[in-house]
């Protein structure tokens, strides 16, 4: 078992999941921020009007639906691109695929953190979902570098990275918001 490679696999999955989940506690504040910034006649204004039809005027329900829509975009694209990145890594190698997609995740997170409009937030989340399809490639790397009797350890490492990412991502997002570290969007505009 190659421990440095497994560490890279762990970090890839962990960073992917933190990037996915860090935004969860920020959705209500982002809804207010981008609605004020872009206005009711914008993309976000149209989305809020559409969600309001389902929520019956309940502001909390609109914020919840907003989080669901924006959050599911990432997950949907991750689902669609997982087999694409898997096939790409079979042809071009696991390492270049992981390096490229991890760089894409970092870029995607920077885009949404500094987004000066809702459209840029959506672009960042979409790019993140596309690049996060690399979790299947990371799992393949773990399987490739572990022998049959050690393969369970490699898969457990993937599970631990997923679990820790889902635990720490929302916590980091919540703390960043409570400490007012998430005013980067306002600084970028």
Sequence positions of predicted segments:
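Helix-loop-helix hairpin linking two adjacent transmembrane segments in secondary transporters
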Residues: 158-189
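Residue-level signature of mid-helix packing/kink "hotspots" within the transmembrane helices
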Residues: 71-83, 133, 166-167
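Extracellular/periplasmic helix-loop-helix junction of adjacent transmembrane segments
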Residues: 30-79
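Pair of pore-lining "gating" transmembrane helices in MFS-fold secondary transporters
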Residues: 3-46
